[in-house]
Curated annotation (Swiss-Prot):
Keywords in alphabetical order: Ribonucleoprotein, Ribosomal protein
InterPro entries assigned: NA-bd_OB-fold (IPR012340), Ribosomal_eS28 (IPR000289), Ribosomal_eS28_CS (IPR028626)
Pfam families per record: Ribosomal_S28e
Annotated source species: Methanocaldococcus jannaschii (strain ATCC 43067 / DSM 2661 / JAL-1 / JCM 10045 / NBRC 100440)
Protein name: Small ribosomal subunit protein eS28
CDD domains for the chain: S1_S28E
Record family assignment: Belongs to the eukaryotic ribosomal protein eS28 family.
Length: 75
């Protein structure tokens, strides 16, 4: 019964670009995504995502205020 409201306050976003991998073992993927609903509809954010993701996937974001820091490209 509680599982029905898992995404009650989450907002859908579509992955429009996979930027690269981050994290010690590369387990986090940095993506550019477009917000599909809520007060920030149409806004493009850079976020870090855990798990497999590709362009066109829909991800659920708990909040749309923060953006991920750019990847360090020094290496």
């Amino acid at each position: 019964m509680e599982d029905e409201f898992v995404y009650k306050e989450a907002v859908a976003a579509e992955v429009i670009e996979v930027i690269g991998r981050t994290g010690v073992t590369g387990g986090i993927i940095q993506v550019r995504c477009k917000i599909l609903g809520g007060k920030d509809t149409g806004r493009v954010l850079v976020r870090n995502v855990k798990g497999p993701v590709k362009v066109g996937d829909i991800i659920m974001l708990r909040e749309t205020e923060r953006e991920a820091r750019p990847l360090d490209r020094r290496r």
